[in-house]
Structures are given as structure tokens and as C-alpha cells.
Amino acid sequence: MDTGKIVQIIGPVIDVKFEISFIPKINFALEIKIKNKKLIMEVMQQIGDGIVRCILMGSSDGLKRGLKVFNLNKGIEVPVGKPTLGRIMNVLGDPIDRKGKILSSEYRPIHNKSPSYNEISSSDELLETGIKIIDLICPFAKGGKIGLFGGAGVGKTVNMMELIRNIAIEHSGYSVFSGVGERTREGNDFYNEMISSNVIDKVSLVYGQMNEPPGNRLRVALTGLTLAEKFRDEGNDVLFFVDNIYRYTLAGTEVSALLGRIPSAVGYQPTLSEEMGILQERITSTKSGSITSVQAIYVPADDLTDPSPATTFVHLDATVVLSRQIASLGIYPAIDPLDSTSRQLDPLIVGEDHYLVARKIQSILQRYKDLKDIIAILGIDELSEEDKILVSRARKIQRFLSQPFFVAEIFTGFSGKYVTLKDTIDGFNSIINGEYDYIPEQAFYMTGNISDVLDKYKKFYS
């Protein structure tokens, strides 16, 4: 018989006893029917004697020992394809936007193997984001993996929202957003922002917010990835956004503790690298289409050496590091140009001009950072004339790296700006060469391209 009964309940961990010949496989979905609703759980361990240990995908309220459990003989499957666009679903693929059932003809299991070595395709093509500091210092590759690293409140979600808006409007591609263990309010704001930007019909949303059980939060990234894989397999270039990878790790830690595994460093699960690898290896481009992944990664206590962000680093092509120090100066996006890196910043990929301008910008900002202590102790007048000019240009560069976002217009009061890569390179090159040494640094703050700076200068300073 493909039915068992509950023998133990410990929070979201349920032990179910089956006849030994009918024991379900790992990752199979089991169903409990209770009070006109269905609860789904996933098999995590086979602990012997016909007993399997499962993790619930919902609340355990109302469960009791002896309840009948049905083996579905397959893993969790979710609807995929174009009917999911503009819709919000949960980890099980059920709609949570009160717009009725998602009418998809195809369902896919959330547990899939990553593409074989022969199917994988790589590309050096750049993905223009319209955000100056990203396009210049840490350019994104089409089909690459990008991490947005930052502590609490430095702008990871806002940067992600701007990226979705820019790429959906300027490149008209499909996006999939997985909200993993984040605030419900943020999910609501995000949904409304997508509607107001008129890009909601190009985005599929999968939410498993922080009040959900750990099993739900652990699997919601896989649900989103399954949707993205379908779009990729149809020949599309897809953007896959995950907010937040740290919560995915945290859910794994909770599940690991509930299953009785001995924790490793700093309390993380011993299977941290494996779980991260299973997710990240599926986020890849094939000969039919590409998945470009942007992942927000919370950094506990701003410590980049913490095992969770450190494990994620190895999978990424570009790292965008958000700095609390830069945010405190009022410069947004608060991206650190000295810490952020990209494998694409290579003269053979981006071109000689782009590469030289980016490296020159970094060297000027690094020199300014080194001089800050001298300026603080002795004052700027004690510097050589050459260093005084360098400091002046560095401060202009710092302010020119700020940019008004479309999704943050309500907060900044500035109209959003999309800046092309050519305008970005030309603008920074002209500052390096001293063409605008006569313009005060305030004119460079919260502007788009260099013509915006000149307009601001004429309006306020001439």
C-alpha cells in the first residue's frame, strides 16, 4: 500500500511509517488530507524499519499521530511556462495572488539534475544594466552568476529591483524572482513596483517569506529555478533573481538541526557546500538559452569570511559588494568599487578602453583612500599639488558613481536614469583627464551621464 501513518511529530519534522516494501524514496512528496486542505511534505531521510523522516512545507497545526499519509510516488511538481508570468506562487506552485489557478499544461519536478557537460554553453557577451558603477567596474556576463553582497539595510533589494526593471524594459527578456525567507512587506512592495514599471507580465514570482517553515524556505529557490529552466529550454535568455541566498543557507541550517545532524563551523549544516553546489550548478546556460542569475547575499555582521557568503563566492562570475561606509556618505548605489570584481573585466572581453578607464578609476580611488589618514591629521593643504588634483578628481568620481534609480524615485526625489556603457566610459574618462576640473564636486552627485552634470552646473553654479 502507498499509504502510511504519522508516528511522530516534532514541529515541522514528521516521521511516517510505511510497509517496508512501499517505503518512499528520498525527495518524494507525501500528502496529508486534513479538514478540507492538503499538506505536502518531502522525504528527507529513511531511518529504517519502514519509517521515513519528512519536512513539512506548511504549518503542522492540527496534525496528530495516526493520521493517514499518501505517497505521491514523485517529487514536488510546479507549473512552468508562460502562464506563470505576472503571477505569484508558493513553493508548491499554488497561486497566492488571488487570481485563480495557474493554467499551465506542463508541470516539472523541482529536483532536477544539472545539465551535462556537453549541453553547457558559455558566453563572453556583456549584459548592459544601465547602472554606471556595475557596467564599468564589475560588468555582468550574459549567462553569468552575480552576487550582491551586503549587510542589513545597504540596498541589496533596491539594486535588484532596479536591475529587473532596467533589463525587462531595455532588453525585453523574461525574469524569474525567488523570494527566499525575506520580509512579506518587501515582497508586496516588489510586486507593486513591477506593476507600476509595467514589467509584471515579463516576471514570474515565487515567494517563501520568513514566516514560512524551514522546509518551505529551503525549497522555494528550487521552485523558482525550475521556472527559469523551462524558459531557458524554450530558447530564451532568462534572468533569475534570488533574494536572499543567505536565508536559503539558514533554512538548510534549521532543517539540518531538526534532522539531528551535527553542525559544523559557526553552527552551519555539515552539508553546506553540497547544498549550495546543487542549487548553483543548475543555474547555468545551455546551447538552447541562458540563465543570468543575480543573487542577493546577506553578510552577517558585515563579515565576508562567514562560511555562508564564503561558500557562495566560489560559484560567482561577478561580485558586487555593498558598503555601509559608502551608504553613510549618502552615495547610492552604495557599491564599493575597490571590493567589487568581475571575471569579465578583461581587455580581451570588454575592450582596451573600458579596461583602462576602470583600472584608472580604481587606482585613483585607492590612492585617495590611502591619503585620507594624512588629510585627517595634517589637512589637505599639506599634500603635493599632484595629490590635491587627484583628491579633487577622486571625490568627483565618487559622486559620479552615484545614480538616481527609477525604483527609488519616491525616496530620492530624483528622476531615474539609465546610462549606456559608452556614456559611462566617456564620462569617467573625461573626469580622469581633467576636462571637468573646473566643475564643483556637488554637480556630479546623483546624475546620469556627463551631460546631466553639465546641465546641473549651468543651472546651479554658473
UniProtKB/Swiss-Prot annotation:
Which positions are annotated as binding ATP? 150-157
The region annotated as signal peptide is: none
Q: Which GO MF terms are attached to this record? A: ATP binding; proton-transporting ATP synthase activity, rotational mechanism
List where in the cell it is found.
Cell membrane
Listed EC numbers: 7.1.2.2
InterPro entries, alphabetically?
Answer: ATP-synt_VA_C, ATP_synth_F1_bsu, ATPase_a/bsu_AS, ATPase_alpha/beta_chains, ATPase_F1/V1/A1_a/bsu_N, ATPase_F1/V1/A1_a/bsu_N_sf, ATPase_F1/V1/A1_a/bsu_nucl-bd, ATPase_F1/V1_b/a_C
| Domain of life according to the entry | Bacteria
Q: Which reaction does it catalyse?
A: ATP + H2O + 4 H(+)(in) = ADP + phosphate + 5 H(+)(out)
> Which keywords appear in this protein's UniProt record, sorted alphabetically?
ATP synthesis, ATP-binding, Cell membrane, CF(1), Hydrogen ion transport, Ion transport, Membrane, Nucleotide-binding, Translocase, Transport
KW Nucleotide-binding (keyword) present: yes
Q: How does it sit in the membrane?
A: Peripheral membrane protein
- Its main localization is membrane
Q: State the GO CC annotations.
A: plasma membrane; proton-transporting ATP synthase complex
Residues passing through the membrane, by range: none
Q: Does the keyword Translocase apply?
A: yes
Subunit structure and binding partners = F-type ATPases have 2 components, CF(1) - the catalytic core - and CF(0) - the membrane proton channel. CF(1) has five subunits: alpha(3), beta(3), gamma(1), delta(1), epsilon(1). CF(0) has three main subunits: a(1), b(2) and c(9-12). The alpha and beta chains form an alternating ring which encloses part of the gamma chain. CF(1) is attached to CF(0) by a central stalk formed by the gamma and epsilon chains, while a peripheral stalk is formed by the delta and b chains.
Q: Which family does it belong to?
A: Belongs to the ATPase alpha/beta chains family.
From the Swiss-Prot or TrEMBL record, give the protein name.
ATP synthase subunit beta
